[in-house]
Amino acid sequence: MSISTVDDLSFYSNVEPNQQRFTEVVKTFQTNFPGDDITFFARSPGRVNLIGDHIDYNFFPVLPMAIANDVIAAVNVNSTNEIIITNTDSKDFLKEVIALRNSQIDQEHHSWANYFKCALIVAKQYLEERGVTSLKGMKLTFNGNVPTGGGLSSSAAFCVASTLAIIRANGITDLTKQDLTRITVVSEHYVGVNTGGMDQCASVCGEPDKLLLI
């Protein structure tokens, strides 16, 4: 099953506040990158787990579901040699510039950019599988309403949205949910987070009003 695209925000149960979020993302993007166009948006939801916390990475079953809270990103694709990430919450998430030639994670530099680099690492590997060896530059503005540290997988939502954005920016339009799940399951391992795949699978494969037995 391929990743779907949307023409409106009707997939949200409550459209108005999310329309305001998208408007805020657009305005912040235009402020951060005046004169640059938004090429597309990327989105990935958080998740809640009903049964089986912290046992997925020991190969036991879990029962999560995706939630409406999500991470969204306005994405510009360009021909530079860098990726610039910004956030509507510029106080807590500072602007970061990431060189395409060096996605190495600096464990001494505790920054949200490390999680984006996790996405960049796995996206690069997938793109190489597909024959893409030269990456596009990007400019992104993120917004997230998945509570950080709230047990709803804000980091997984961020990594999945980032991975999806990178792959789409580099011309892949037939990415499947299976492949996106496969490559993002290990993404947070690069910052030392022990994940077993529940978070990413729920974020990628979750459907409205449905639980996932994983």
From Swiss-Prot:
One of its GO terms (cellular component) is cytosol. One of its GO terms (biological process) is galactose metabolic process. The active site is at D199. GO terms for molecular function: ATP binding; galactokinase activity. Alpha-D-galactose binds at R47, D53, H54, D56, D199. Pathway: Carbohydrate metabolism; galactose metabolism. Its EC number is 2.7.1.6. It catalyses: alpha-D-galactose + ATP = alpha-D-galactose 1-phosphate + ADP + H(+). Coiled coil: none annotated. Keywords: ATP-binding, Carbohydrate metabolism, Galactose metabolism, Kinase, Nucleotide-binding, Transferase. It holds the Pfam family GalKase_gal_bdg. ATP binds at G149, G151, S153, S154. The record marks R47 as: Transition state stabilizer. InterPro entries: Galactokinase (IPR000705), Galactokinase_CS (IPR019741), GalKase_N (IPR019539), GHMP_kinase_N_dom (IPR006204), GHMP_knse_ATP-bd_CS (IPR006203), Ribosomal_Su5_D2-typ_SF (IPR020568), Ribsml_uS5_D2-typ_fold_subgr (IPR014721). Belongs to the GHMP kinase family. GalK subfamily. Galactokinase is a key enzyme in the galactose metabolism where it catalyzes the conversion of alpha-D-galactose to galactose 1-phosphate. Can also induce the transcription of the gal genes in response to the organism being challenged with galactose as the sole source of carbon. This is Galactokinase. It comes from Candida maltosa.
